[in-house]
């Protein structure tokens, strides 16, 4: 029965939200699914389920009911309903602080620019006849304030721009890799490594997860092409050795210095070897450079099916 009062609507939404939670859906996944369930259950076929229109009609009319679904989730869960479409982030050091540069999710091409005016975010939606999508790089730096942005020198803005450009290609390469189950694991390791590095006190975890990401990317590339790779013993986790195999079998020459910096011994993982911020950041930067080189080799521009 269609609710006709706020009390009836609240009771319906609490019950529906509990049902969706029991199915394992997180807060960000529930608004659209809730709107679909309400539409199907109450026979509201043909009514837009996304809301957003200012013309909602009468209270508890079909359009108003579905708009209330989104209102209810926004009021109840707030930012937890927001979906983060970013493919990933890179970390840089500036003025002694670690900063996260979160990459935007872009469908198609876009133009990058950098401006200390953070209100100038760019044009994020391109329509026919309109300028192409544009993005202010400083708006990707998490926690950047207008006051801090205005203090940046020209060289510092160029540093940020360079890290964004190379980091974007690296992150998109990792995000687009297909054809081996290791790639999904590598993406998780990468996110964990960035999160750990940004905390400032999980540095051993950051280094280990960085090495795990590199190891699984390299093994995934080898395995995808049918080449053998070590699975146990010292060479099973030897990043430099895996780099040699990638060069031998795939013709991609990865810098030995970067492979060595990314490599991490089990002693780090188990807390037997102390890690510093400098070591963890150096490993992260080396991994980003390796992923950038793999992007230039176009290892992600294939039509491999998901495993």
Can you annotate each of these PLM segments?
Residues 184, 191, 211-212, 288, ...:
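Generic structural signal for well-ordered, non-transmembrane alpha-helical segments
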């Amino acid at each position: 029965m269609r609710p006709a009062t706020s009390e009836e609507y609240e009771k319906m939404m609490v019950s529906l939200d509990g049902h969706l939670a029991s199915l394992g859906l997180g807060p960000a996944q529930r608004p659209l699914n809730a709107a679909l369930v309400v539409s199907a259950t109450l026979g509201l076929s043909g009514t837009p389920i996304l809301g957003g229109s200012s013309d909602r009609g009468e209270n508890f009319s079909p359009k108003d009911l579905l708009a209330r679904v989104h209102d209810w989730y926004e009021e109840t869960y707030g930012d937890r309903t927001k979906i983060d479409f970013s493919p990933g982030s890179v970390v840089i050091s500036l003025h002694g602080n670690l900063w996260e540069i979160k990459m935007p999710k872009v469908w198609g091409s876009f133009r990058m620019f950098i401006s200390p005016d953070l209100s100038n975010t760019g044009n994020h939606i391109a329509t026919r006849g309109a300028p192409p999508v544009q993005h202010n790089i400083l708006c990707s730096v998490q926690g950047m304030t207008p006051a801090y942005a205005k203090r940046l020198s020209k060289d510092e803005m160029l540093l940020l721009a360079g890290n964004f450009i190379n980091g974007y290609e690296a992150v998109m390469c990792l995000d687009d890799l297909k054809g081996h189950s290791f790639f999904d694991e590598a993406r998780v390791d990468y996110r964990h490594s960035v999160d750990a590095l940004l905390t400032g006190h999980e540095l051993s975890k950051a280094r280990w997860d960085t090495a795990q990401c590199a190891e699984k990317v390299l093994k995934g590339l080898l395995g995808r092409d049918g080449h053998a790779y070590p699975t146990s013993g010292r060479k099973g986790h030897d990043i430099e050795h895996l780099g040699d195999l990638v060069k031998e079998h795939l013709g991609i020459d990865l810098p030995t210095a970067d492979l060595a910096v990314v490599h991490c011994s089990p002693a780090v993982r188990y807390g037997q070897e102390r890690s510093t911020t400098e070591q963890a950041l150096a490993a992260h930067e080396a991994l980003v450079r390796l992923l950038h080189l793999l992007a230039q080799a176009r290892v992600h521009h294939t039509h491999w099916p998901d495993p």
